[in-house]
Amino acid sequence: MSFFTLEELAYRPGPSGVTLTLGGEPAEAFDAVINRAKLYGDDWQDRVERLTMLSNVPGLRLFDPADVWVTGYSKFLMAQRLAAAGLPVPPTRSATSLTEVEEACEEWGAVILKPSFGYRGTDVERVADFAADKAVAEELLSRYPTLVCQRFYPTSGGEYRITVAGEATPINMLKLPAAGSWRCKTMEGATFERFEAPDDLVELSLRATRAMGITLAGLDILPTPDGYVVLEVNPVPAYLSMLGRDRIDL
């Protein structure tokens, strides 16, 4: 077993004109590669390019290839893929202006605004009343030319984080927001506990993960009066920092 970073991928002359090396070794020498690459950052174009180069190596099994990884990172692509598979997702639209945010509020009431490419809940905001929260939307639009705008669902009952690995769901958590907060975010006071996911929730999680083509995923699923809603299928599951707290069996 070998470990290498995306920065250690390189083009070199080869028998067919060009070959790819991974940490100095020919890519063809590997049977499979497990991808846990980070695509965020100022150098994201370079990182996507390198991961795509790796995905194009003939005969190499990559878990998971660049197209799957990018779709899992993009909120817009993810919503499109899940909806096309008939899975329950929040009503979603793009917003490039305050007018479009206001129109969404008129249609859905409270809405969530966030960048399509984001992580750890950064710059995810709720606009519950457009007139009162207009400055929040204005600030986000000043930094992101296009925002994901989705209907907001109450989170008082918590949010499920289901981990899917192949056909198994080894770690299932219920995240509960802190008192007075709508955010199911552990870094902002939310708590979490393990629970036994019911069969219908497990099946939905497996279907969503298959639709995305992801091998190892962490799903955020919200229970609503109308049934489950799939918020996100993350290619990097995370474990809510629980490995640094109480030891559990993985």
Question: Which residues does each PLM region occupy?
Answer:
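Protein kinase-like catalytic core scaffold
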Residues: V111, V148, P170-I171, A217, ...
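Conserved protein-kinase catalytic-loop segment immediately C-terminal to the catalytic Asp
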Residues: I112, L222-P223
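C-terminal active-site "lid" helix and adjoining low-complexity regulatory extension at the edge
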Residues: E196, P223-L250
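Rossmann-like NAD(P)H-binding beta-loop-alpha module
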Residues: A85-G109
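Phosphate-binding site of ATP-dependent enzymes
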Residues: T122-M212
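Short glycine-rich anion-binding loops that position phosphate/pyrophosphate groups of nucleotides
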Residues: K38-Y40, F117-G118, V236
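Conserved N-proximal alpha/beta basic substrate-recognition cap immediately N-terminal to
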Residues: M1-P91
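ATP-grasp fold ATP-binding core
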Residues: L82-A83, C105-D123, P145-T155
